[in-house]
């Protein structure tokens, strides 16, 4: 025997603190069990846990309740001390001994599998106490996996053994709780003679006359000590009264639960209670020595073995000396060269045993192996997780929209680092705090606090990008929109690209949302098509899945304040369960509902004084906050495989409930502490290793104190295992900075924690406004708990990773906690050798492209250390690509920035790529430019290219041709390369190049091959197999070598046509080998003839070039090989082509209908290569056109030149390789061109060879083309709840039409009705009426008077005031807001003013909602052409809101004045200003109220003074409005910053027009506005009106559309005037579209004039009167009363109506409905399809399916139906 092994199992868990040492041991086993290298350990622990749970279920209720819940058997280590006080303590310790010993044994041998080579002949097992059970498991199992299979039975034995011992011992001595409470059952006595001790015990028992069951007994001696067992009272008497033992050194073993090894109390009946029947497959395999007899146990089965062991453990005295003696004798007899004592843990027995062996066997080498230490030293993380549930979760991307302008993670960090508190009064776009807040709490349904923390501009959204129509966008909850946006940004941050790595079918979304404010309040004011899908919570994550085409689950989670952290946990759980491979998760909260404020305020949740004062003595509740955030999660191993940036790693997550709290909303510190311990166990970490806890910390007294208590008790306990002084616990909460985001609170905390890891700084806690809350634990400093009032550095430890916990409490009682570990740095393991990189930028719109370019250039220039390779990799392989594109080739980031910068200016004029598939032709080169080392760099670096080359070379060698690899690698001299090898190398490299391009996503639409290149072309087209192509090329070349004499014939390239050559060449014989272009011909013949011909042609002025080739290909010289070539290749099989082949042999295109066989290729060897003729035929046939892109497969671009010169309109012809140029540089140039041409490229495959050298960088996110989609909450109906406020005047029910009511703008009231809180007015005015002459003629456009939009505004003011005066009590005063005004078709005054030119006005008021819908109808055209909504509001609240902007506006006015003084801005007089304005509008003196104008590009101010006389009877004179507001139009039409020579700008709409005080005659005002670009050639601005230094009026979001000046005559021409020619603008053609200002909506029916009944009264005595009645089926929505958009001229009526209908329903400009416009891109979905299909059926009589619009692709498809 060369080596003997003795395995020793002791009888206990390692000594020491059970909550320290033991936890560390079991924690290590837990972590190892999660790794793929330890499957048997994982199986073993699962089996032991399962068996333990089964045994637990068998217990009686009283005992079941003693055992705490556990997920793994290892969790019970946390409860050892407590369990010792119960009847289960001993049983649990026995099971933990088993789990520790066998777990360590298995882990060690899984790490060192070769060491598990135990044989019965050289291995002995010895053990003591419960260690015998562990030894039995090993003895019964010849292989390691079998230990796991028997472990369930061994676990049951261990547990039952403990139960029996406890049961028996309690029957001997009463012990109500801890079995050892009265004293120890075992004493260890040192330094006594065993025999004398035995005799002393015997005498003592006899003297005391104990019953046998109460006697003491010696059950073990090991030479150094004696163990005595017995009831505690007996042993206490023994050691206090017995003279022999009083003087001994003895130790009571109080940790040992009970006694055994005594036949006085145990018998076979106890053995039978313990031992289950075990499957007979387990037989004794290794010798196991009895600690009683000292001999190997003999057993016929596992059951037999365990019964023997248990009988000895219960009833027999241990004789360890016998065991040692017999084992030693066995070893001596075997005489091994060495012995190894394998012990689970160090012990005195191991040392004594080794010492004895060394004395008895001095010539033998003796070693020991401490498995426990070896296991503790095993590295973690060296292998992948064994399964999904064992994985760590990587956070790979994040994005946010948080309060205080924190629109991305970096801005969020700046806010935290600066210690900012961003709470503010509730913005007016949410609701009016003047009416909805009552600090006294007396007004019903109001909030007591006006504060919150709010996201900037929550309505901003890029609807077109996300395929949503403007209508759908407006009706969709902004928090769901922002969830979609942040999901995109987080995915972009993570480098996710569809089709790369994670499959879309394996991605899910999980979002927390706990309110529906927008649906309940904002969109609920006017329920539309998208009320449900736009507002219900399930659609939030569902819309994300739908947009990105994710197939995984989408969950909306509501657990109140912990919703988003619970959603993150749900996402992690889905990853752990294997349901998904990637999750996008987060939370959302946008506040608009005053009811929630009122409810929380009345429920005493909210602070009445402002922000969250967490841990402050004055904490008085929380401050509400907006917030939307998204993170991207993957299993760690997947993230590493995908080369992602890992921001942090989730180790464990869990949720429990504060079910025992005093109320449902009250936290419970015990439940919270239980949760923290649970996640720590799952994570396999020591809670004291956690360095930072991001707490819930809302600033409520109950919540803060309970959470602090639970956190400190677990992570910084005051007793027992406490924190080291150099390891403080920092705590913080984001809520002190930006409030409580409620459903978004968890994602705010989570993102903050990611940033804390990233920055290595814990930002200051700013919640302490006065002093620390005295309710917090007094010993925080002693516990080493730090609340950082200033920023604290969180030092990275080299030997362990930093750990943090994020904690959330939900108001409904849920607690969610997540343990996060910092990400380990990942070194680069290779090098990117490419000299130049392709930098790509793209967008869906020109504006976004420009902004993307600006942001990127700024980003690059600010980071000199940036790697250009990382930049290229991020922007190409890890970003999505769109149709507006820019790409540059750069060798450095500085060069990249300089090349990108010029594109910023040109990007707005860029034409997008259509998205249609561009035809790509692969052209395969001949042999004329051969060189050594073709594709050398690709072969070296690209696995894909190398794979194909190696496969092809393998085929070459198997056909008995020489390898061509030396030609590729460059390891050969040119003269040593045969024709055969050269030809094979050329063709095989071309095939490999084609396959490489295909891996890049570039696949050929057609192929053409030149000469030798035809073989590669046919292989790529599927005609020839690779093997057949190699065989044909090799055979042909071999025949050429053997049958054709080299260098007797040659080839001559001539820059002339064949006809010119024939004419100039005289009688010199030659053959035309190749026709490469119109004036490019290759000739063949004898060398002498070629030399003569060269001289002759040169003399004639033609350029010639002799080709360095050994033969004259495609001439009669080839005749010598044709017959033999036919014979040798007749078995070659040719298939039908899969793509068109442009054939130079036949000079035509060949398709799958053409037959190609070997004769084709043999003929091609001999016959002329008519490359130019083939190209010409392809062009004539339409296969090739201007858009075709040519990609040359070959070692040098020769065909590219032929193609460009033959087809002069060729778009581009690009090379794959180029002589004397690095392969990667050539590829990069070509890819750059392809990308710019709109070709989809698989950049991941391009970068794959170097990916381990590349890193994803945090480049700027996509720049959105945002527009504000926001439905404003109007009025105060949330307060009234059906109770009208103010009360309606009860006397006003039905009002007869007043004959006396007439103003300058409203000439006649047709009808006026007031019923049930509603009012309906119909009125009429005539544009030709003398009362309007001044304001209409004084506002002339194109030379004609126009009823301006401001005149229509005056009408709205007048009718609204009429309704108010008649409906409300006289004491009530309102401000009138003319809002959502849209003016779709101008009203131009007729030339013949003798005829009336009426317009009808309808006003419908909802007096409870305090709003009036006003519409204008043009009877002459039978269209509703204008509409607005008037709101009655409190002007004092306007003034209050505007006052916050006063400083900003006045500062801009002051700046403009200063610029005028210095000449930087233009100051214009009245005459000059209106003269410039005259380019578009001819203003009469009545209108010329601007006294001076200061103009600076897009910004202006005007000093305005009104005349003393209003010139009529007005509510708000239209020329007064014009004098203030037309400054916005002057910037565009009168200045020089905008092109108003070729264009003009007119306003179709504004969002709101409000004047808080009357515009007084003679009054002096200041107007200020800045106009900024919006969508689709439009501009928008807010006009501020100041009286003195106070803002008294605002026109918000006034919109101007840009139109070509040639349209002016079309827009502004009276109906009774024929069209006059418009002035032509050079380079401009007149559009064929009938103009309309803005996309708008349809009137299903024209209005009807219905006679009034006599009893309704009439204003005119000569008329029965009329009212404008609502048409049948008319919706009260004002959109339905508008005119259809106008389609292009020249269409049939149905087509015009259909396109107008589509534009109306999608709320898009009809100009966007071009033939190739994609329906889906315009925002169409299934709901909109139903609506439009129904309308086409009803209004046009078309028979179409509901799904019609989902089945068509473009507008052209719709037109095809209508033709």
Curated annotation (Swiss-Prot):
Domain Ketosynthase family 3 (KS3) as annotated: residue spans: 390-822
The keyword Cytoplasm is assigned to this record: no
Residues covered by the Carrier domain: 1689-1763
Pfam (any one): SAT
Effect of deleting the gene: Impairs the production of alternariol.
O-(pantetheine 4'-phosphoryl)serine carried by residues: 1726
Domain PKS/mFAS DH: 1307-1609
Stretch list, region C-terminal hotdog fold: 1461-1609
Gene Ontology molecular-function annotations: 3-oxoacyl-[acyl-carrier-protein] synthase activity; fatty acid synthase activity
Keyword terms: Acyltransferase, Phosphopantetheine, Phosphoprotein, Transferase
SMART domains: PKS_AT, PKS_KS
Region (Disordered): 1619-1690
Compositionally biased tracts (Basic residues): 1635-1647
Spans annotated as Product template (PT) domain: 1334-1588
EC number(s) recorded for this UniProt protein: 2.3.1.-
Segments for region (Malonyl-CoA:ACP transacylase (MAT) domain): 922-1227
Comment, domains: Multidomain protein; including a starter unit:ACP transacylase (SAT) that selects the starter unit; a ketosynthase (KS) that catalyzes repeated decarboxylative condensation to elongate the polyketide backbone; a malonyl-CoA:ACP transacylase (MAT) that selects and transfers the extender unit malonyl-CoA; a product template (PT) domain that controls the immediate cyclization regioselectivity of the reactive polyketide backbone; and an acyl-carrier protein (ACP) that serves as the tether of the growing and completed polyketide via its phosphopantetheinyl arm.
Protein name: Non-reducing polyketide synthase PKS19
Species classification: Eukaryota, Fungi, Dikarya, Ascomycota, Pezizomycotina
């Amino acid at each position: 025997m060369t080596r003997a092994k003795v395995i020793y199992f002791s009888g206990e868990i390692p000594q020491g603190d059970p909550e320290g040492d033991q936890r560390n041991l079991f924690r290590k086993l837990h972590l190892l069990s999660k790794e793929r290298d330890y499957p048997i350990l994982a199986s073993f622990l699962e089996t032991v846990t399962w068996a333990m749970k089964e045994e637990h279920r068998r217990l009686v209720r009283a005992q079941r309740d003693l055992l705490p819940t556990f997920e793994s058997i290892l969790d019970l280590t946390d409860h050892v001390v407590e369990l010792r006080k119960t009847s289960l303590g001993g049983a649990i310790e026995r099971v933990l001994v088993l789990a520790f010993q066998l777990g360590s044994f298995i882990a060690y041998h899984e790490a060192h599998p070769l060491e598990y080579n135990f044989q019965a002949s050289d291995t002995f097992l010895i053990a003591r106490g419960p260690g015998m059970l562990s030894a039995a498991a090993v003895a019964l199992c010849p292989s390691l996996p079998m230990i796991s299979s028997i472990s369930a039975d061994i676990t049951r034995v261990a547990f039952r053994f403990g139960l029996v011992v406890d049961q028996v011992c309690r029957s001997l001595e009463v012990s109500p709780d801890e079995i050892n409470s009265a004293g120890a059952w075992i004493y260890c006595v040192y330094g006594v003679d065993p025999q004398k001790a035995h005799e002393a015990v015997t005498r003592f028992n006899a003297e005391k006359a104990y019953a046998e069951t109460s006697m003491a007994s010696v059950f073990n001696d090991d030479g150094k000590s004696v163990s005595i067992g017995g009831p505690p009272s007996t042993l206490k008497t023994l050691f206090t009264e017995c003279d022999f033992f009083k003087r001994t050194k003895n130790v009571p073993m109080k940790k040992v639960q009970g006694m055994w090894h005594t036949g006085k109390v145990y018998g076979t009946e106890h053995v039978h209670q313990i031992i289950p029947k075990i499957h007979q497959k387990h037989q004794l395999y290794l010798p196991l020595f009895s600690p009683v007899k000292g001999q190997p146990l003999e057993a016929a089965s596992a059951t037999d073995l365990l019964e023997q062991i248990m009988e000895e453990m219960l009833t027999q005295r241990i004789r360890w000396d016998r065991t040692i003696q017999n084992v030693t004798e066995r070893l001596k007899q075997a005489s091994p060269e060495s012995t190894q004592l394998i012990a689970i843990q160090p012990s005195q027995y191991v040392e004594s045993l080794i010492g004895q062996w060394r004395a008895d066997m001095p010539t033998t080498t003796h070693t020991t192996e401490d498995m426990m230490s070896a296991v503790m030293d095993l590295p973690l993380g060296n292998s992948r997780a064994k399964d999904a549930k064992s994985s760590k979760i990587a956070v790979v991307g994040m994005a946010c929209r948080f309060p205080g302008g924190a629109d991305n993670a970096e801005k969020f960090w700046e806010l935290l680092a600066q210690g900012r508190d961003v709470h503010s009064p509730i913005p007016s776009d949410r609701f009016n705090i003047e009416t909805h807040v009552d600090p006294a709490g007396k007004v019903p349904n109001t909030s007591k606090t006006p504060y919150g923390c709010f996201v900037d501009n929550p309505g901003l959204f890029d609807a077109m990008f996300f395929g949503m129509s403007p209508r759908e966008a407006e009706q969709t909850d902004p928090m769901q929109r922002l969830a979609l946006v942040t999901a995109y940004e987080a995915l972009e941050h993570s480098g996710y690209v569809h089709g790369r790595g994670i499959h879309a079918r394996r991605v899910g979304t999980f979002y927390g949302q706990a309110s529906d404010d927008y649906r309940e309040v904002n969109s609920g004011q006017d329920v539309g098509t998208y009320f449900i899908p736009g507002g219900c919570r399930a659609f939030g994550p569902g819309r994300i899945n739908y947009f990105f085409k994710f197939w995984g689950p989408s969950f909306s989670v509501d657990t109140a304040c912990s919703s988003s952290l619970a959603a993150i946990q749900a996402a992690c759980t889905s990853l752990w369960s294997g349901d998904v491979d990637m999750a996008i998760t987060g939370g959302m909260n946008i506040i608009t509902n005053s009811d929630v404020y009122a409810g929380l305020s009345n429920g005493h949740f909210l602070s009445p004084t402002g922000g969250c004062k967490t841990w402050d003595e004055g904490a008085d509740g929380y401050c509400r906050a907006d917030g939307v955030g998204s993170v991207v999660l993957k299993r760690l191993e997947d993230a590493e495989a995908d080369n992602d940036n890992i921001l942090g790693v989730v180790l464990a997550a869990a949720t429990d409930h504060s079910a025992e709290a005093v109320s449902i909303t009250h936290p419970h510190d015990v439940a919270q502490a239980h949760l923290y311990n649970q996640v720590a166990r799952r994570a396999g970490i020591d809670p004291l290793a956690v360095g930072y806890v991001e707490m819930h910390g809302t600033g409520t007294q109950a919540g803060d104190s309970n959470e602090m208590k639970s956190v400190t008790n677990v992570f910084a306990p005051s007793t027992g295992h406490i924190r080291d002084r150099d390891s403080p616990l920092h705590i913080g909460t984001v809520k002190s900075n930006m409030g409580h985001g409620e459903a978004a609170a968890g994602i705010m905390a989570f993102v903050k924690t990611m940033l804390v890891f990233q920055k290595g700084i814990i930002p200051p806690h700013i919640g302490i406004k006065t002093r620390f809350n005295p309710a917090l634990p007094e010993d925080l400093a002693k516990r080493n708990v730090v609340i950082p009032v200033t920023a604290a550095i969180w030092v990275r430890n080299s030997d362990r990773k930093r750990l943090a916990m994020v904690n959330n409490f939900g108001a409904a009682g849920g607690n969610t906690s997540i343990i996060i570990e910092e990400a380990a740095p990942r070194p680069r393991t290779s090098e990117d050798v490419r000299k130049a990189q392709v930098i790509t930028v793209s967008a869906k719109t020109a504006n976004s492209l420009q902004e993307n370019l600006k942001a990127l250039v700024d980003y690059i220039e600010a980071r000199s250390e940036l790697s250009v390779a990382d930049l290229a990799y991020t922007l190409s392989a890890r970003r999505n690509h769109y149709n507006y594109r820019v790409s540059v080739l750069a060798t450095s980031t500085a060069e990249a920035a300089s090349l990108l910068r010029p594109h910023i200016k040109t990007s707005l004029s860029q034409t997008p790529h259509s998205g249609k598939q561009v035809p790509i032709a692969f052209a395969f080169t001949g042999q004329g430019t051969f060189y050594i080392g073709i594709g050398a760099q690709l072969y070296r670096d690209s696995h894909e290219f190398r794979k194909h080359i190696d496969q092809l070379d393998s085929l070459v060698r198997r056909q008995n041709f020489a390898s061509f690899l030396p030609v590729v690698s460059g390891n050969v001299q040119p003269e040593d390369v045969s024709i055969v090898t050269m030809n094979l190398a050329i063709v095989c490299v071309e095939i490999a190049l084609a396959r490489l391009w295909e891996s890049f996503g570039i696949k050929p639409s057609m192929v053409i091959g030149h000469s030798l290149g035809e073989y590669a072309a046919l292989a790529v087209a599927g005609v020839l197999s690779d093997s057949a192509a190699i065989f044909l090329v090799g055979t042909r070349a071999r025949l050429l070598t053997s049958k054709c004499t080299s260098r007797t014939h040659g080839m001559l390239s001539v820059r002339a046509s064949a006809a010119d050559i024939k004419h100039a060449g005289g009688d010199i014989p030659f053959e035309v080998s190749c026709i490469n272009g119109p004036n490019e011909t290759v000739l063949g013949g004898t060398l002498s003839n070629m030399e003569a011909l060269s001289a002759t042609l040169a003399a004639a002025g033609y350029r010639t070039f002799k080709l360095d080739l050994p033969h004259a290909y495609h001439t009669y010289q080839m005749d010598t090989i044709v017959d033999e070539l036919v014979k040798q290749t007749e078995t070659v099989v040719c298939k039908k082509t899969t793509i068109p082949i442009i054939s130079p042999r036949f000079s035509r295109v060949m398709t799958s209908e053409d037959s190609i066989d070997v004769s084709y290729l043999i003929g091609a060897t001999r016959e002329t290569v008519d490359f130019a003729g083939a190209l010409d035929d392809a062009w004539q046939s339409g296969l090739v056109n201007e858009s075709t892109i040519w990609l040359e497969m070959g070692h040098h671009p020769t065909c590219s030149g032929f193609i460009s010169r033959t087809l002069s309109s060729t778009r581009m012809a690009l090379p794959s390789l180029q002589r004397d140029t690095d392969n990667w540089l050539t590829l990069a140039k070509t890819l750059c061109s392809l990308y710019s041409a709109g070709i989809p490229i698989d950049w991941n495959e391009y970068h794959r060879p170097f990916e381990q050298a590349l890193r994803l960088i945090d480049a700027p996110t996509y720049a959105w083309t945002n527009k504000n989609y926001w439905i404003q909450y109007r009025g105060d109906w949330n307060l009234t709840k059906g109770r009208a406020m103010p009360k309606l005047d009860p006397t006003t029910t039905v009002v007869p039409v007043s004959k006396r009511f007439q103003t300058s703008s409203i000439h006649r009231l047709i009808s006026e009705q007031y019923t049930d809180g509603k009012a309906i007015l119909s009125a009429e005015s005539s544009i030709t009426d003398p009362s309007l002459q001044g304001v209409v003629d004084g506002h002339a456009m194109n030379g004609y008077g126009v009823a301006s939009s401001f005149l229509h505004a005056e009408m709205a003011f007048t009718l609204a005031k009429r309704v108010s005066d008649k409906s409300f009590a006289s004491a009530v005063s309102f401000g009138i807001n003319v809002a959502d005004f849209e003016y779709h078709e101008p009203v131009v005054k007729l030339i013949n003013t003798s005829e009336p030119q009426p317009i009808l006005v309808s006003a419908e008021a909802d007096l409870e909602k305090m709003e009036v819908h006003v519409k204008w109808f043009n009877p002459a055209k039978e269209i509703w052409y204008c509409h607005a909504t008037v709101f009655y509001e409190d002007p004092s609240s306007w003034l209050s809101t505007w006052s916050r902007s006063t400083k900003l506006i006045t500062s801009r006015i002051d700046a403009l004045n200063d610029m005028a003084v210095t000449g930087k801005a233009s100051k214009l007089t009245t005459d000059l200003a209106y003269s410039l304005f005259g380019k578009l509008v001819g203003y009469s003196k009545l209108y010329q109220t601007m006294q001076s104008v200061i103009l600076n590009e897009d910004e202006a101010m005007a000093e305005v003074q009104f005349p003393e006389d209003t010139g009529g009877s007005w509510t708000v004179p239209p020329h007064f409005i014009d004098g203030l507001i037309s400054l916005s139009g002057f910037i565009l039409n009168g200045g020089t910053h905008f092109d108003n020579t070729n264009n003009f700008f007119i306003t179709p709409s504004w969002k709101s027009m409000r004047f808080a005080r009357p515009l007084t005659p003679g009054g002096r005002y200041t107007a200020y506005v800045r106009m900024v670009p919006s969508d689709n050639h439009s501009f928008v601005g807010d006009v501020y009106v100041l009286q003195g230094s106070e803002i008294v009026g605002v026109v918000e979001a006034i919109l101007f559309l840009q139109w070509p000046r040639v349209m002016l005559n079309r827009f502004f021409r009276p109906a009774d005037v024929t069209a006059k020619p418009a002035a032509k603008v050079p380079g401009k053609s007149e559009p064929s579209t009938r103009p309309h200002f803005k996309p708008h909506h349809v009137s299903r029916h024209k209005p009807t004039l219905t006679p009034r009944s006599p009893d309704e009264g009439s204003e005119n005595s000569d008329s029965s009167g009329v009212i404008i009645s609502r048409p049948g089926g008319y919706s009260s929505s004002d959109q339905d009363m508008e005119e259809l958009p106008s389609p292009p001229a020249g269409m049939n009526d149905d087509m015009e109506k259909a396109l107008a209908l589509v534009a109306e329903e999608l709320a898009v400009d009809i100009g966007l409905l071009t033939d190739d416009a994609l329906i889906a891109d315009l925002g169409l979905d299934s709901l909109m399809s139903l609506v439009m299909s129904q309308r086409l059926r009803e209004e046009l009589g078309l028979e179409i399916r509901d799904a019609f619009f989902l089945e068509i692709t473009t507008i052209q498809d719709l037109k095809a139906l209508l033709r």
